Every structure is written in structure tokens, then in C-alpha cells.
Amino acid sequence: MPRKGPAPKRPLVLDPVYGSPLVTQLINKILVDGKKSTAERIVYGALEGAREKSGGDPVAALKKAMENIKPSLEVKSRRVGGATYQVPVEVKPGRATALALRWLVGYSKARREKTMTERLRNEILDACNGLGAAVKRREDTHKMAEANRAFAHYRW
């Protein structure tokens, strides 16, 4: 087995419009089949729509939405004896951001609006206000961790 350790993280190229690493990560998460310009058009359109609807800085709205979506706890399966327990563990910051982006994009795709730009804009605005499916997913994750608090001593 190789003993070099994990590969170093590659630096993130910031997006040209907002210069925000979060916007870059969102673009990369929406990216399908390598069509970066399409992904950029969707994200920038959604952020412009968010600016028009909320009247504020769209990147600040996205950051607020991400804070409302990011989980602080999750459950991981742990096998002890013959039983499998759902053990609550804290979520590392990088994973919390990745999960939040995954949920934001996933629940945006599931919405009923006509274009992906509209769906993403409305999901961001809903999450900003503490509403929406992505925020509900975070609450469900926290509820699950709270319900399995008795197994917290199985942490590793």
C-alpha cells in the first residue's frame, strides 16, 4: 500500500464575476458533461435574479443560505457486535460546505419552476429565509443525530 498520504488539495480558480470561492464551487457542482459556460450562465442568472428580488448583494445572500443549509452534525453507521448503530458525529467544515452545495443543487433540480436558473434562485432565496427543501434536509439530519445521541459514545 502506498504511504504518501492524501493528495494535496488543488487551489480553486475564483470565478471572474464575483471572485468568490463559494460561487466557483457552486458552478462546479452544477456542471454537467463539462459544459462550464452553461453552468456559469445558470449560476450568474440565479444570482442576478436573487439581487433583483432581495435588493442586496447576491453573494451575501448565497453565504447566508449556505449557513442555513450547512449541517453541524450527521450520523454515520457503525457496526458493533451484530448490530449497526447510527452514531452522531460532528461534520468538518469542508464536508459541511460540500453537503450544503449538494443539497442546494439537488433540491433546486427537484423544484417545479421552468428553468434551472429560476429553480436555483428560488431555492437560494428560500434557504436565505430559513425555508425550502435544503434547509428541511439539514433539520432532518440534525433530528436524526439528536435521536441517536445515546450512541454518541461509539464515536471513533
Swiss-Prot record:
The keyword Cell membrane does not apply. Pfam families: Ribosomal_S7. SUPFAM superfamilies: Ribosomal protein S7. One of its GO terms (biological process) is translation. The keyword Ribonucleoprotein applies. Coiled coil: none annotated. GO terms for cellular component: small ribosomal subunit. GO terms for molecular function: rRNA binding; structural constituent of ribosome; tRNA binding. InterPro entries: Ribosomal_uS7, Ribosomal_uS7_bac/org-type, Ribosomal_uS7_CS, Ribosomal_uS7_dom, Ribosomal_uS7_dom_sf. It comes from the Bacteria. Keywords: Ribonucleoprotein, Ribosomal protein, RNA-binding, rRNA-binding, tRNA-binding. Part of the 30S ribosomal subunit. Contacts proteins S9 and S11. One of the primary rRNA binding proteins, it binds directly to 16S rRNA where it nucleates assembly of the head domain of the 30S subunit. Is located at the subunit interface close to the decoding center, probably blocks exit of the E-site tRNA. PANTHER family: RIBOSOMAL PROTEIN S7. Belongs to the universal ribosomal protein uS7 family. This is Small ribosomal subunit protein uS7.
